[in-house]
Amino acid sequence: MANFRHIVRVAGVDLDGNKQLRWALTAIKGIGINFATMVCRVAGLDPFMKAGYLTDEQVKKIEEILADPVAHGIPRWAVNRPKDYETGRDLHLITAKLDMAIREDIMRLRRIRAYRGIRHELGLPVRGQRTRSNFRRGQTVGVSRKKK
């Protein structure tokens, strides 16, 4: 534990070496605190250790788990893309792949003219919120003062 690094690169993202490992991993898009803790436990690492003390072998182990978490023993319900639309596999996407998958999902919904796709096109709320008072766009009309 002598070699401390202030910046640790995991899955193409620079992590803060001064933070606890589980909190440092949340800097990777697509990884929350619960998933980060699971990755630490599966890798056999202490989630509370400083990320700067990771060795290269431990970083490789974390990257392997992130590449295919279900194969390494992380439960299926914890992944962010169970039963993927194209492949049918349980995937956990991170960084740019996650952004692309979300964009493709929205484009597919728009292409098939699903209700959610149309709401995305129009820039309206997708999940059933009311729109009478919120989600208003455009110029606001000011209130004129009463003359004395």
Swiss-Prot record:
Transmembrane regions: none
PANTHER family, sorted: 30S RIBOSOMAL PROTEIN S13/40S RIBOSOMAL PROTEIN S18, SMALL RIBOSOMAL SUBUNIT PROTEIN US13
Protein source organism: Pyrococcus furiosus (strain ATCC 43587 / DSM 3638 / JCM 8422 / Vc1)
Classification of source organism: Archaea, Methanobacteriati, Methanobacteriota, Thermococci, Thermococcales
Domain of life: Archaea
HAMAP family on file: Ribosomal_uS13
GO molecular function, one term: structural constituent of ribosome
Protein name: Small ribosomal subunit protein uS13
The family this protein is said to belong to: Belongs to the universal ribosomal protein uS13 family.
Annotated Pfam families: Ribosomal_S13
Keywords from the named record: Ribonucleoprotein, Ribosomal protein, RNA-binding, rRNA-binding
GO biological process, one term: translation
Role according to the record: Located at the top of the head of the 30S subunit, it contacts several helices of the 16S rRNA. In the 70S ribosome it contacts the 23S rRNA (bridge B1a) and protein L5 of the 50S subunit (bridge B1b), connecting the 2 subunits; these bridges are implicated in subunit movement.
Subunit structure: Part of the 30S ribosomal subunit. Forms a loose heterodimer with protein S19. Forms two bridges to the 50S subunit in the 70S ribosome.
GO cellular component assignments: cytosol; small ribosomal subunit
